[in-house]
């Protein structure tokens, strides 16, 4: 009976009706032939064959009756009755998801998320980004506000006190002089007063005098360290307790060439044994080009007494006026003033 099915199926499918009263196919054979004919139509049309047509036909127990062309209604209508887990992939060793619209997040056992999956994902909105660290918030880049440019107008911010026990710093900013002054009574004061040395030496100007002074008070309460430019004539920034002294160039000394020394004349028992020499012109170009920090890094401390230079100081202050006249003849530059005073512990 099975061997004659291919030859008899062609006339039946093509429209040929066999003689009535003869049982040609069973219900299972007829359903399988219809399925194969439908697959053939998909192949001829060039359309992908649906997966349901590729599933094997499992006959129902009630469909055991023989199909007869004489009484087609006698046989029940055949349906594909499949268990949800029994599918094409289960037949070939793989399991097809019976609920593809459902989120696939499971605990590995029986529980499964009941929400619908996202159209572009296998998971719902809650479980789409479960693998990522959701506790970490996105970092927003904060743009720093640009620093305001210095204005030519005079702006002074001063906070000072004259209490010797608890000195407070003071900050002073001038119009053409951009200065930083931190100091108070009873504290050491560091003062740097110089124009833009980098621009000066880049233009080929020559430094006439490299000035470096160190003042040491008898009481030890106030100490000043000052660096002044050749074009600056403002000596008011020196500590009030330290009087200015004339300048003289030593004849024969072990210091660097072009070096000048200043000192506060003290009693012999209070005289410090520290000598600070300025740098040469070539060293000044490198140090002043890099800023005041480079100048301080190259200061040479020598353990030589200052007594041999005391006798060489001028007895009068006329040299100061001559120095001011020489500076007035030179080209004036905008002065940049930096004054820092650091509290020093009192030495008994």
UniProtKB/Swiss-Prot annotation:
<comment type="similarity">
    <text>Belongs to the GRF family.</text>
</comment>
<feature type="domain" description="WRC">
    <location>
        <begin position="97"/>
        <end position="141"/>
    </location>
</feature>
<keyword id="KW-0539">Nucleus</keyword>
<dbReference type="GO" id="GO:0032502">
    <property type="term" value="P:developmental process"/>
</dbReference>
<keyword id="KW-0010">Activator</keyword>
<dbReference type="Pfam" id="PF08880">
    <property type="entry name" value="QLQ"/>
</dbReference>
<comment type="function">
    <text>Transcription activator that plays a regulatory role in gibberellin-induced stem elongation.</text>
</comment>
<feature type="short sequence motif" description="Bipartite nuclear localization signal">
    <location>
        <begin position="94"/>
        <end position="112"/>
    </location>
</feature>
<dbReference type="InterPro" id="IPR031137">
    <property type="entry name" value="GRF"/>
</dbReference>
<feature type="compositionally biased region" description="Basic residues">
    <location>
        <begin position="127"/>
        <end position="136"/>
    </location>
</feature>
<feature type="short sequence motif" description="Bipartite nuclear localization signal">
    <location>
        <begin position="130"/>
        <end position="137"/>
    </location>
</feature>
<protein>
    <recommendedName>
        <fullName>Growth-regulating factor 5</fullName>
    </recommendedName>
</protein>
<dbReference type="GO" id="GO:0005634">
    <property type="term" value="C:nucleus"/>
</dbReference>
<dbReference type="GO" id="GO:0006351">
    <property type="term" value="P:DNA-templated transcription"/>
</dbReference>
<feature type="compositionally biased region" description="Polar residues">
    <location>
        <begin position="329"/>
        <end position="340"/>
    </location>
</feature>
<feature type="region of interest" description="Disordered">
    <location>
        <begin position="125"/>
        <end position="165"/>
    </location>
</feature>
<dbReference type="GO" id="GO:0006355">
    <property type="term" value="P:regulation of DNA-templated transcription"/>
</dbReference>
<feature type="region of interest" description="Disordered">
    <location>
        <begin position="306"/>
        <end position="348"/>
    </location>
</feature>
<dbReference type="GO" id="GO:0005524">
    <property type="term" value="F:ATP binding"/>
</dbReference>
<dbReference type="InterPro" id="IPR014977">
    <property type="entry name" value="WRC_dom"/>
</dbReference>
<dbReference type="Pfam" id="PF08879">
    <property type="entry name" value="WRC"/>
</dbReference>
<feature type="compositionally biased region" description="Polar residues">
    <location>
        <begin position="148"/>
        <end position="161"/>
    </location>
</feature>
<feature type="compositionally biased region" description="Basic and acidic residues">
    <location>
        <begin position="306"/>
        <end position="320"/>
    </location>
</feature>
<feature type="domain" description="QLQ">
    <location>
        <begin position="24"/>
        <end position="59"/>
    </location>
</feature>
<dbReference type="InterPro" id="IPR014978">
    <property type="entry name" value="Gln-Leu-Gln_QLQ"/>
</dbReference>
<keyword id="KW-0804">Transcription</keyword>
<keyword id="KW-0805">Transcription regulation</keyword>
